[in-house]
From Swiss-Prot:
Enzyme class: lyase
Name of the molecule in the record: dTDP-4-dehydro-6-deoxy-alpha-D-glucopyranose 2,3-dehydratase
GO MF annotations, alphabetized: lyase activity
Biological classification of the source: Bacteria, Bacillati, Actinomycetota, Actinomycetes, Kitasatosporales
Residues binding dTDP-4-dehydro-6-deoxy-alpha-D-glucose 2: 157, 260, 325, 341-343, 346-347
Origin species: Streptomyces violaceoruber
Quaternary state and interactors: Homodimer.
Source superkingdom: Bacteria
Encoding gene, per UniProt annotation: gra-orf27
Length: 443
């Protein structure tokens, strides 16, 4: 199936939602089929020893007065594949996307990449159906051209060292299209990114790495770039931030995580303040998935987060205010993150407000360039949402705190294509920024 406009996409998407049967049932952790609580550590594990586990983490930083805490965290050592196939039709690049159910999606069905599969999925550990189109990404054929292939991190607050392989492959061959998939023009994908809870996280992270093209949503080609900081200066700043923020993290038994308790009545793990997140259990039925029923733990955040880039025109070029951000589970300790990335409801009473949070929350309507609520990874997180914003902050000073710097959209796009440099929330915003008509152009 190949659609030509947004209306055609929504008609196809509604049809796919009606074609399948899904049911997600909240279930106590101690009743999850195939899962158990380790009596020695309290960790929640699958009886096969595969997939993922819920463990404890102790985190702190070596700098004076650095934060320190313990928390539950998802440990998933496997590296999955997130891949998008591109093909040109009538001079327009189209992306092969799928309508995919995930148990944590707030609206069940969202737009996923061509391939979204864990290592266990595509090696069929669970004896499920083969993953469609996986060979184009693992063993590209004669008609396939790899444009982008990088190991990228995922949510460092909730995953321990989690990475997935992000791949974009252009194909010229004939592709049989399953009814749950369709070719979407790249300009239409740009429009879909503005719809709440429609394009899933796995799609967004790959879209951030798409190659430039002359169509809508590309980074404009400029004869001369005029960034505030050149590459050497940015690397110097980023290396300095990694030296300043030297984390010490150790996995610990889940039973030894302070401030968290198991609520036996509800079968959940919760924080004593009711903040942050809960670890819950679900039973899932989905006739469109490789395995049609299963049980699993999930991380359910409390409240909606705010993720934002403040932008500013400098030297006639649109710049983004980027943060060197350390998170407990980040694979390489520090990554490039958005200007603001937090859940305001989780801020401790009396604690200092994160820099620029109030700038974002009090922005005037005319400053808002992008404002959409997106879901996070629905395979491990239950109803996790963030409000993603891009603001015109031309009244924000050029001089910024030491953990912040200004980068052009093109500079951040290049960094994002390397892998393990730009965090997943910033990659979502990067995918969104690249849809704005004047994001890199001078006025």
């Amino acid at each position: 199936m190949r659609i030509t406009d947004t209306a055609g996409f929504h008609a196809w998407f509604a049809e796919r939602g009606a074609a399948h049967r899904y049911r997600i049932t909240r279930t106590p952790l101690h009743d999850l089929e195939g899962w158990y609580t380790d009596p020695a550590s309290g960790d929640v594990r699958h009886r096969s020893g595969r997939f993922f586990s819920i463990e404890g983490l102790r985190y702190g930083r070596q700098e004076p007065d650095g934060p320190a805490w313990t928390q539950p965290i998802i440990r998933q050592p496997e590296t999955g594949v997130l891949g998008v196939l591109i093909k040109w039709f009538d001079g327009v690049p189209h992306l092969l996307m799928q309508a995919k159910m995930e148990p944590g999606n707030i609206n069940t069905l969202q737009v996923s990449p061509t391939v979204q599969a864990t290592f266990s999925n595509y090696t069929r550990v669970h004896h499920g159906s083969p993953v469609r189109y996986i060979d184009h990404f693992l063993t590209p054929g004669a008609g396939d051209r790899v444009h982008y292939d990088a190991l990228q991190s995922e949510q460092g607050s909730w995953f321990l060292g989690k990475r997935n392989r992000n791949i974009v492959v252009e194909t010229t061959g004939e592709i049989p299209v399953h009814e749950d998939f369709c070719w979407v023009p790249r300009p239409v994908m740009a429009e879909l990114l503005r719809v709440d809870n429609l394009v899933n996280m796995d799609s967004r992270t790959v879209l951030a790495g798409l190659p430039d093209d002359p169509g809508e949503g590309s980074v404009p080609r400029r004869a001369v770039e005029k960034p505030l900081h050149d590459t050497a200066a940015l690397l110097h700043w980023f290396t300095g931030a990694k030296v300043r923020h030297r984390p010490e993290r150790t996995t610990i038994p889940l039973s030894r995580v302070g401030g968290w308790r198991r609520d036996d009545d509800r079968g959940e793990i919760v924080h004593e303040t009711g903040r942050y997140f809960r670890i819950i259990g679900v039973d899932v039925e989905a006739d469109s998935r490789e395995v049609t029923s299963w049980s699993q733990p999930m991380l359910a955040p409390v409240g909606r987060g705010v993720v934002a880039f403040v932008s500013k025109e400098i030297h006639g070029e649109r710049h983004l205010l980027v943060q060197a951000r350390a998170e407990a589970g980040t694979f390489d300790a520090v990554e490039l993150g958005p200007t603001v990335q937090c859940n305001p409801g989780n801020l401790p009473d009396g604690a200092p407000r994160p820099p620029y949070l109030d700038t974002v929350l009090t922005a005037r309507p005319e400053q808002v360039l992008f404002d959409t609520v997106h879901s996070e990874e629905g395979g491990r997180f239950y109803h996790a949402e963030n409000r993603y914003l891009v603001l015109d902050g031309d009244d924000v000073p050029v001089d910024v705190p030491e953990d912040y710097t200004w980068m052009t959209v093109r500079q951040l796009t290049r960094a994002g294509r390397i892998g393990n440099l730009v965090d997943v929330e910033a990659r979502t915003l990067l995918a969104c920024v690249r849809t704005l008509p004047d994001h890199g152009a001078s006025r």
